[in-house]
């Protein structure tokens, strides 16, 4: 289709999008065939530039504040018109995709991008259905115009770029953002607002399925191990980041994966390594003179990424969904070295730790966080993406856990034997052994030891894991120092939890002083 002197490229194939991206100088090919691009000064999400339009459907339903920022409806209309006119004056790319693999819960999306590579990214991450919108639902529009420059005083934005969600108009406006992760997370936020109304829990988690049909969920913030641990050659991958849990089903919202690449190795992450080939996109990965990716080079960012479609994963759930989960795992990266490698949680503890979302920002995906590592609490293990009040999601989680009798575990992928800089981080093979024990059912009804202060129950034995690693206190040379660190962590938990209005039983399920 042609508009004036420019072309609108609609539903191009992967090969065609790669060809267009190369011809337009948007990227280069790595020796694996993956398209390599740079995203400029933004190499992660920009939370301060994310807004939701305030209108009757959102006014009283959203937890407004520094995460969910209000944007006026009239300003949105004016800015959308400006961005659309700018985009229509040049070549651009349109693809029709779905968000949500379950037939009852998919959103049909018209994705318009200024660049070929961001359209390819969307084709990697969203679902490319055999038939678009068979149920004839109202269509969402994503308008992603990377080279538009917002004017804050005129447009009402915070900077030269923005991500604005308009639920009333079913529109997502992304302007001035070359980091493509904004697009996938914007549609995740849309589903996170809509799904609870259908009694479906939206989750920032990975999911895989065993030979017997048993499903495991992996909740966690970026860098805690969701993508790595769910990419298991002995199981079938459902997805690595965004899922919905309804009665009888866990379904992927996406059609691809978005893996962190820092220190990626074929030995530790063979599934991801093999997926980075023709049709994949590498963001901010440095190539050597032979076009070989150097995943140890963080000169552009610690948040280098690979986007690839699920078709690049040999062992995957063809239906992109599974049954309800036998095991629910909360991944936390504990910088203090206080938490054990695995704890078995009851329902109240599950609610407490889900609401707390304790972890560390590791090579953070957010702009402005730098390369440093710091502890954080992120409600629902994904606070930036959940627009409703946190309690609504926690109630749905408990309802789902109770309904299916899912077992819940807290798994520490962070430090032991001392805090960051003193102790050592649990190795990926150790954590994989913990996960394997959970999935085998070995920890169901296991004999446990109670850890005071942090108020957790630890199995006394885990197949494949050294027994001395299980109780973190035994790993510290200075036991008094451990006790002080545990009290310090407990204080952080208690202080953070004051903002939640929940039952006394849930409050009592957390660390106690």
From Swiss-Prot:
Its cofactor is Mn(2+). It catalyses: oxaloacetate + ATP = phosphoenolpyruvate + ADP + CO2. Binds 1 Mn(2+) ion per subunit. Pfam families: PEPCK_ATP. GO terms for cellular component: cytosol. GO terms for molecular function: ATP binding; metal ion binding; phosphoenolpyruvate carboxykinase (ATP) activity. Keywords: ATP-binding, Cytoplasm, Decarboxylase, Gluconeogenesis, Lyase, Manganese, Metal-binding, Nucleotide-binding. Mn(2+) binds at residues 185, 204, 241. Its EC number is 4.1.1.49. Gene3D superfamilies: 3.90.228.20, Phosphoenolpyruvate Carboxykinase, domain 1, Phosphoenolpyruvate Carboxykinase, domain 2. ATP binds at residues 185, 204, 220-228, 269, 305, 431. GO terms for biological process: gluconeogenesis. It comes from the Bacteria. Its main location: cytoplasm. The keyword Hydrolase does not apply. Substrate binds at residues 45, 179, 185, 305. Pathway: Carbohydrate biosynthesis; gluconeogenesis. Monomer. PANTHER family: PHOSPHOENOLPYRUVATE CARBOXYKINASE (ATP), PHOSPHOENOLPYRUVATE CARBOXYKINASE ATP. Involved in the gluconeogenesis. Catalyzes the conversion of oxaloacetate (OAA) to phosphoenolpyruvate (PEP) through direct phosphoryl transfer between the nucleoside triphosphate and OAA. This is Phosphoenolpyruvate carboxykinase (ATP). It comes from Pseudomonas putida (strain GB-1).
């Amino acid at each position: 289709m042609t508009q004036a002197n420019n072309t609108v490229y609609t539903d191009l194939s992967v090969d065609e999008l790669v060809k267009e991206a190369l011809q337009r100088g948007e990227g280069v090919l790595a020796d694996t065939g993956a398209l390599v691009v740079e995203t400029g000064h933004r190499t992660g999400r920009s939370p301060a530039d994310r807004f939701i339009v305030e209108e009757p459907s959102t006014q009283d339903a959203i937890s407004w504040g520094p995460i969910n920022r209000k944007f006026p409806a009239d300003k949105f209309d004016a800015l959308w018109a400006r961005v659309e006119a700018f985009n229509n004056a040049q070549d651009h790319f349109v693809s029709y995709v779905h968000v949500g693999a379950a037939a009852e819960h998919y959103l049909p999306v018209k994705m318009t991008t200024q660049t070929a590579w961001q359209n390819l990214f969307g084709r990697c991450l969203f679902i490319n259905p055999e038939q678009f919108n068979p149920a004839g639902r109202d269509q969402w529009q994503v308008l992603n115009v990377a080279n538009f420059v917002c004017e804050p005083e005129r447009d009402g934005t915070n900077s030269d770029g923005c991500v604005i969600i308009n639920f009333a108009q079913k529109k997502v406006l992304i302007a001035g953002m070359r980091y493509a992760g904004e697009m996938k997370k914007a549609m995740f936020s849309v589903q996170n607002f809509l799904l609870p109304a259908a009694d479906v829990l939206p989750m920032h988690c990975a999911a895989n399925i065993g030979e017997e049909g048993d499903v495991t969920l992996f909740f966690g913030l970026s860098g805690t191990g969701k993508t790595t641990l769910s990419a298991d050659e002995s199981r079938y991958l459902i997805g690595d980041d965004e899922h919905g849990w309804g009665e009888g089903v866990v379904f992927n919202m996406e059609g691809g994966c978005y893996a962190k690449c820092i220190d990626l190795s074929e030995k530790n992450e063979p599934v991801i390594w093999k997926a980075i080939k023709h049709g994949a996109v590498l963001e901010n990965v440095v190539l050597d003179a032979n076009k070989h990716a150097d995943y140890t080079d963080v000169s552009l960012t610690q948040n280098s990424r690979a986007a690839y479609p699920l078709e690049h994963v040999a062992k995957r759930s063809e239906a992109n969904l599974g049954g309800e989960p036998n095991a629910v795992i909360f991944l936390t990266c504990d910088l203090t070295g206080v938490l054990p490698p695995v704890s078995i949680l009851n329902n109240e503890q599950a609610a407490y730790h889900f609401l707390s979302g304790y972890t560390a920002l590791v090579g953070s995906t957010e702009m402005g966080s730098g390369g440093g590592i710091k502890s954080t609490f992120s409600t629902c293990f994904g606070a930036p993406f959940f627009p409703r009040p946190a309690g609504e999601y926690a109630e749905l989680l408990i309802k789902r856990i109770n309904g299916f009798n899912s077992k819940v575990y807290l798994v520490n992928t962070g430090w032991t034997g001392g805090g960051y800089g003193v102790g050592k981080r649990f190795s990926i093979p150790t954590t994989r052994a913990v996960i394997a024990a959970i999935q085998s059912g070995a920890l169901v009804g296991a004999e446990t030891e109670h850890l005071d202060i942090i108020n957790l129950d630890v199995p006394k034995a885990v197949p494949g894991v050294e027994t001395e690693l299980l109780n973190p206190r035994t790993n510290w040379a200075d036991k008094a120092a451990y006790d002080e660190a545990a009290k310090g962590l407990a204080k952080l938990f208690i202080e953070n939890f004051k903002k939640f209005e929940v039952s006394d039983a849930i409050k009592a399920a957390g660390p106690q002083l």
